[in-house]
Amino acid sequence: MRILLDNFSKSFGSTKVIENMQLEVGNGEMLALLGPSGCGKSTTLFAVCGIHRPTGGRILFGDRDVTDLPSQARNVGVVFQSYALYPHMTVAENIGFPLKVKGMPTADIRKEVDRIAGLVQIGNLMERRPAQLSGGQQQRVALARALIRKPDVLLLDEPLANLDAKLRLEMRSEIRRIQRETGITAILVTHDQVEAMSMCDRIAIMKEGEIVQIATPAEMYNDPKTAFVAGFLGNPPITFLRGVLDKGAFTIPESEIRMPLPDTVAVAEGTKLMLGVRPEHFTPAGDIAVPGKVTFAETQGRENLYDVLLSGGPLLRSIQPVRNDIHVGDDVFWAIDSRGVFVFDENGRRL
């Protein structure tokens, strides 16, 4: 089921939250709305769900205009951050409740419950109550309840926020598997870049009620259009160096950093610039050598993370395979890989 938000706007009183948004989610696609708190991603999801009525524009499911339809008439499945399971009901009763409300015969409900329980792999938990379940098991029950009505659209609002790191990893892959097996169109709302990049076909990054870029995870990471997007994706995050164009090279005044810029960056001498350098692009193997001193070193299992204070003051972060010969206080002569550097103007627009 294709979803289209056509010039979608939403205000609360005199406060405009979203204005003239244009967004299309393809049939069978899983799309993430990613951004900081307050950017409008949940407001967008609630409008698709039917909880919020748009102030302007249209919402279409396929060719069907659902803008003015209530939630119950839209055939959507929703999983919220709080799973909202009924504590007095068993797992089977929780999952089957939407069908019971619709008046489906008990035998048919049981058949559907068994089918969906097999899909989300909780067939052995049918007689337990929510208090007897782990966080991951409760999440699976909530997902099963959302899917049992065979919705056209699945909406996920921060569904993994209450899980620990191990369970989040497990449920990321499980939700993605289920979405692919069912072929359902899904929208995920999250502020977690790892969730968005690992679970979704495309990501729409939002800022202050606007979509600033929409692309596949790989395209978004490797070709950010703004410094905001570049800074939002990546862990450890990208480092921004501020300088000016001097004789064709990016230069940080009072430092030894000079980096020739590609011919595609056509700006005037003296223009203020920002250089974005990801940690994986500052290593001993780069092509623009810069001296510095290690101020922080951390082992992260398979990798080491370093903070290096460059001559002249700026700090660069480096991530490398584990090595034991670098310590805090050491002088290093590493290099920036110019092929992985992003150049932005002083306002954060990619050049």
Language-model-detected regions and their locations in the chain:
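Helix-to-loop junction immediately C-terminal to a conserved catalytic motif
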Residues: 49
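Non-catalytic connector elements of ABC transporters
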Residues: 236-240, 247-351
